[in-house]
C-alpha cells in the first residue's frame, strides 16, 4: 500500500493533478479530501488537499 499527497491553491488544480495521477495503472483504495481556509487581513486563503491511498498493479 502506498500514498500520494496533493496540495493546491485552487480546486480545479487539485482535480487536474489527481486525474492525471489516476491515469496510471493503479488500484485506488481510498481518497481523503480536506479544505483549509485561513483569513488574512486582505483576503481568504484556501488550501485544497487530498491523499490517494493505492496499490500498484504488478
Ranges and model annotations:
Residues 3-26:
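Short, well-ordered alpha-helical segments
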Residues 32-37:
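Generic short beta-strand segments
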Residues 6, 28-31, 52:
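Hydrophobic beta-strand residues in large extracellular and virion-surface proteins
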Residues 44-58:
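C-terminal edge-of-domain segments
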Residues 2, 27-30, 47:
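Localized chelating/binding microdomains
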Residues 38-43:
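Short proline/glycine-enriched turn/loop segments at secondary-structure junctions
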Amino acid at each position: 500500500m502506498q500514498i500520494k499527497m496533493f496540495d493546491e491553491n485552487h480546486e480545479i488544480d487539485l482535480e487536474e493533478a489527481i486525474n492525471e495521477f489516476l491515469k496510471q495503472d493503479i488500484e485506488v483504495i481510498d481518497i481523503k479530501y480536506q479544505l483549509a481556509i485561513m483569513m488574512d487581513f486582505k483576503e481568504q486563503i484556501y488550501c485544497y488537499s487530498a491523499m490517494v491511498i493505492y496499490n500498484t498493479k504488478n
